Design a protein with these regions (language model features):
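Membrane-interface transmembrane helices that cradle and orient dolichyl/undecaprenyl
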Residues: 51-52, 89-109
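Membrane-interface alpha helices of multi-pass inner-membrane proteins
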Residues: 73, 110-136, 166, 180
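Short hydrophobic/aromatic helix or loop-helix immediately within or flanking a transmembrane segment
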Residues: 1-23, 223-231
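Transmembrane-helix motifs of polytopic, lipid-linked glycan transferases
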Residues: 29-54
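Short hydrophobic alpha-helices at membrane interfaces in multi-pass membrane enzymes
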Residues: 58-63, 100-119
Length: 231
């Protein structure tokens, strides 16, 4: 099995719902909370836009996301670590679009982004690649402030930014100690010359399997005949 290679904070959170008598029957509370949170956020956003008659493309986006997650993500038992993180990614995109295209309170908006990106990465370590969206945030801030030192001050003064950086460092260090890779299973981030490191061929095989699964080339009861060609 994969063991601790693909750990997620969702596992630890779900373990809190292992209660006497009820036992593991409340494990699904965690994805219910995530889906409920997303629905609440989207409903509030859509309602505020409609109530103030400020219709724009973000309103349409939020409405489409609301419909999408309730049609395709309604089966709570299938969430795992992927779908809960994907729901938050859709919310994150909405917040980034809002910050980039409209006048908002920068400090408040940045805090939301750091919290969302932090949760996404904590839920699914592989999604640390979405941390690249941080570049978009810095670029937007630089365009507004026109001064790198001012941008740096805004980031450093934000407590969530420091927590975000600590989370990234901790996650990379954890991945390295467990697998020999900074981002598992991304082969280019691996140092397979270490004694404890997973063999690079095994990392590549798992990376291909993830890609095959993500592109619909495999499922619980089927898989394509030629995975490499399919990918």
């Amino acid at each position: 099995g994969l063991g601790l290679r693909t750990s997620s904070s969702l596992f630890y959170l779900s373990s809190m719902f292992y209660l006497p008598f009820i036992k593991y029957f409340t494990f699904q509370i965690t994805p219910v909370l995530i889906l409920g949170f997303a629905n609440l956020v989207l409903i509030i956003k859509i309602y505020n836009d409609l109530n103030s008659k400020r219709y724009n493309f973000i309103t349409i986006y939020n409405l489409l996301v609301f419909i999408f997650i309730n049609i395709f993500f309604y089966r709570i038992s299938e969430h795992g670590t992927d779908k809960s993180a994907q729901i938050l990614i859709l919310i994150l995109i909405s917040e980034i679009l809002l910050m980039v295209n409209f006048k908002v309170i920068i400090e408040k908006s940045i805090t939301k982004l750091f919290v969302l990106i932090g949760l996404i990465i904590a839920f699914k370590a592989f999604y640390i690649l979405y941390g690249l969206l941080f570049i978009v945030i810095i670029y937007h801030l630089f365009q507004i402030k026109k001064n790198f030192s001012n941008v740096l001050k805004i980031l450093i003064k934000n407590y969530f930014f420091l927590s975000f950086i600590f989370l990234i460092i901790l996650l990379l260090f954890h991945n390295f100690l467990i697998t020999g890779c900074l981002i598992y299973p991304v082969p280019i981030s691996c140092f397979d010359n270490n004694l404890w490191a997973i063999k690079i061929n095994e990392v590549k095989d798992l990376n291909n399997w993830y890609e095959q699964w993500a592109k619909g080339g495999a499922g619980p009861n089927f898989r394509v005949e030629d995975p490499i060609l399919y990918i």
